[in-house]
Amino acid sequence: MRQAKFNDGWRRTQELSNYNCQLRQVSINDAKGVSDKFCLELDNGISVLCGKNGVGKSTILKSIYSCIKKNGLVNNRLNLSDINISLKNNNHEVQDINNAVVNYLEPSVECNKIIRFLNDSDNINDFIEGIEPSGFLGKKENIAIIGNIIGRVYSKIEFYEVEGALDDDYTFPFIKVTLPDGVEYSCLEMGSGEYLCMYIFWFINWIEKNSILLIDEIENCISVYSQEYLMDYLAHVSSQRGIWILLSSHSETILSKVGIKNARLISNVSNVGISVVSPKHERKYFTALGIKPRKKGIFIVEDKFSYMFLKGMLNRAASDIAYDYH
């Protein structure tokens, strides 16, 4: 997939007309352990929640899912009556949010569950007997895209959608690949990152169009290289299929891809509770994650007096610039 097509995907995520179902606001009131002023506002097809471990990112995602879905499949510690969600459809407020289609995904958890189930099964061939591999996902273009994401060349990839084997209402992909030298193997022999990337690729194409997708810690087991290409692909499919994505992440690569404008910083102070802010400068969320932002450049001055003058002026008028440059 060409880089220009990737970049167009990111541009299109900014065009809200591409999304029929938009998660625009989440407010939480009078909930124990949550700030009284908690209000998460979103205005892009892909947004990211960032913050240190244990501050409440997963709690927020699970609360959103449970509030819309109301099926009890995802454990949630907040009282749903304290949560107010605003969805928009074609620029109009959705009156019954329970009609929206929402999916919650912890990729590493799902993949581990699937592989563990397959390893414990006596005859795996029984699961895929009579099932034809997906013609769409097995196209040459998609094989090339998956290869770019993972950093490996494949000559053939087969996705078998197995339904009702692991659970009554559960579908997962059993995947077989062939390399250019003729070597064949399945998801049981894949590295965790390889199967995880293919699983996310399958999932984003399997779920309904014009739905909401909540992804918790997408970067687990995935290399920095693959994170970059995977996010580009998600942006492309998100804008093409109208899938509104909110994810949580600690990854500098993913935060940089999504951009500071679409990042929301989650914190949890003992006397305040879970809070959310929209950082205006990248150093605020990088520092909150324990990541030291790279300097953008260097100012060269003539002498110490010039250095002191410039430093004082920047600290007074533009502290962010002073922080960004040596």
Regions found by a protein language model. Give the residues of each.
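Extended helical coiled-coil dimerization/tether regions that scaffold
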Residues: 2-17, 115-189
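Pre-Walker A-like glycine/lysine-rich segment at the N-terminus of P-loop NTPase domains
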Residues: 14-61
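Conserved ABC ATPase signature
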Residues: 50-54, 172-201, 218-222
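A conserved segment at the C-terminal end of the G1
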Residues: 62-69
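GG-anchored amphipathic helix commonly corresponding to the ABC/SMC/Rad50 NBD signature/C-loop
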Residues: 67, 190-215, 228
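ABC ATPase nucleotide-binding domain signature region
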Residues: 69-132
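H-loop/switch region of ABC-family ATPase nucleotide-binding domains
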Residues: 248-250
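RecA-like P-loop NTPase motor core
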Residues: 256-326
